Amino acid sequence: MGCGCASFGLHACTSVPITERKQLRLIPEAKLNAQAEQLYEKVKEKEKLSKDITTLNKIKNIGSKIENSITEYFARSNQPDPTVNFRWEYILIENKKVKNAWCMPGGKIAVYTGMLDITKNDNGLAAVMGHEIAHAVAKHSVERASRGTLLNVGTKILDIATKGAVSNVNRTTGMDTVGLLSQIGIMNPFNRKQESEADYLGLIFASLSGYDIRETVKIWERMREANKGKEPAEFMSTHPSSTNRINNITSWINEVTLE
């Protein structure tokens, strides 16, 4: 599946900032941003928020530097700032078992305390946050929601074309066709592209903010060690394997540093 622009017209097709990869956006960004704000509030109610104000302030400080670097970059480039409608917010979730961080559409960011064992320092934290913010800058959530819409339409067309055979198979096997296609062959390769794109953009954002992006390689080495024996085969994963990720990042570091 391509980006789907030919099927839905140029108004639904745009490009990712910096990489200029074509992407499909059928869902209004403002709609996802509003939904993200609501969900973020629910997360804050449900999860235990850390009382470590020092670390939270560090996260906010790093985030602020990345925010400003992104805005300044696009201003210098005479390009629209993709974060102009973001309402940035940061939380630190107390959960040592979860080694994760994320950024919702619109700049709603969370870091789990378990991730701090992987990041180790400011450079590492900036690398992780730069990556997560890159997902939001590249509008990956909008893109994935749009492709989900496209996939649902395609499945309905397939069901009509097969006179209900697809639905009959689903009822017999209990298998969700959309779910299966989302896991293998259609959605995952695209998701891996998004992850690699966020790796690349994240390096740029962290570097522009004054951080040593060489720490990114060490992060993924530590993550690989933490996930030893647990990491799924890349084909069935939405993320590139740690080894491939390290190789890609290593090859990009000099290029990004020189920009």
How would you label these PLM feature ranges?
Residues 3-259:
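A Zn2+-metalloprotease active-site environment signal
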